[in-house]
């Protein structure tokens, strides 16, 4: 349509080494995100022996562990997964903002695609909907975004 060279990422994860960083807080939700992401990448060719899951206490710990993984040079991409549900205090805002900023900075500093699957919901029902119910599985979406970005970057 535009008559120019276009680079797009193919959704083929064969041969890639992928790490997942998942918060244990709200694990009933997060486990569904992890399951969706792992299944998605396996269906797109990633061998299970090339996938590593690292569990951390919660969303606030995700950036530092993601940084360590990125700096190791062992992984082609990382998927971060967690669920933060709003409470009565501003704690929610601080945790969500710092996690997002930290993960984005790790991605930029290391030229490494990171799929961001941190649910930030007002209610547990919203989280359930986004973890494989009415609103799909945001773990799958994070894995897909990471995979496509890995393949785009390999062509640049």
Curated annotation (Swiss-Prot):
NCBIfam families: lumazine-synth, PRK00061.1-4. Pfam families: DMRL_synthase. Pathway: Cofactor biosynthesis; riboflavin biosynthesis; riboflavin from 2-hydroxy-3-oxobutyl phosphate and 5-amino-6-(D-ribitylamino)uracil: step 1/2. This is 6,7-dimethyl-8-ribityllumazine synthase. The active site is at 91 (proton donor). It catalyses: (2S)-2-hydroxy-3-oxobutyl phosphate + 5-amino-6-(D-ribitylamino)uracil = 6,7-dimethyl-8-(1-D-ribityl)lumazine + phosphate + 2 H2O + H(+). InterPro entries: LS, LS/RS, LS/RS_sf. It comes from the Bacteria. 5-amino-6-(D-ribitylamino)uracil binds at residues 25, 59-61, 83-85, 116. Belongs to the DMRL synthase family. Gene3D superfamilies: Lumazine/riboflavin synthase. GO terms for cellular component: cytosol; riboflavin synthase complex. GO terms for molecular function: 6,7-dimethyl-8-ribityllumazine synthase activity. One of its GO terms (biological process) is riboflavin biosynthetic process. (2S)-2-hydroxy-3-oxobutyl phosphate binds at residues 88-89, 130. Its EC number is 2.5.1.78. Catalyzes the formation of 6,7-dimethyl-8-ribityllumazine by condensation of 5-amino-6-(D-ribitylamino)uracil with 3,4-dihydroxy-2-butanone 4-phosphate. This is the penultimate step in the biosynthesis of riboflavin. It comes from Maridesulfovibrio salexigens (strain ATCC 14822 / DSM 2638 / NCIMB 8403 / VKM B-1763). Keywords: Riboflavin biosynthesis, Transferase. Disulfide bonds: none annotated.
């Amino acid at each position: 349509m535009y008559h120019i060279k276009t680079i797009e990422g193919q959704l083929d994860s064969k041969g890639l080494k992928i790490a997942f960083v998942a918060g244990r807080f709200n694990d009933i939700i997060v486990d569904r995100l992890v399951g969706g992401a792992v299944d998605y990448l396996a269906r797109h060719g990633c061998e299970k022996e090339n996938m590593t899951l690292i569990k951390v206490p919660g969303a606030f710990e995700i950036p530092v562990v993601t940084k360590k993984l990125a700096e190791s040079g062992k992984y082609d991409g990382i998927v971060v997964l967690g669920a933060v549900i709003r409470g009565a205090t501003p704690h929610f805002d601080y945790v969500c903002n710092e996690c997002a900023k930290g993960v984005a900075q790790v991605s930029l500093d290391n030229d490494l695609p990171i799929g961001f699957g941190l649910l930030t919901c007002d209610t547990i029902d919203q989280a359930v909907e986004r973890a494989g119910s009415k609103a799909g599985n945001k773990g799958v979406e994070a894995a897909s975004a990471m995979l496509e970005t890995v393949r785009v970057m390999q062509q640049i």
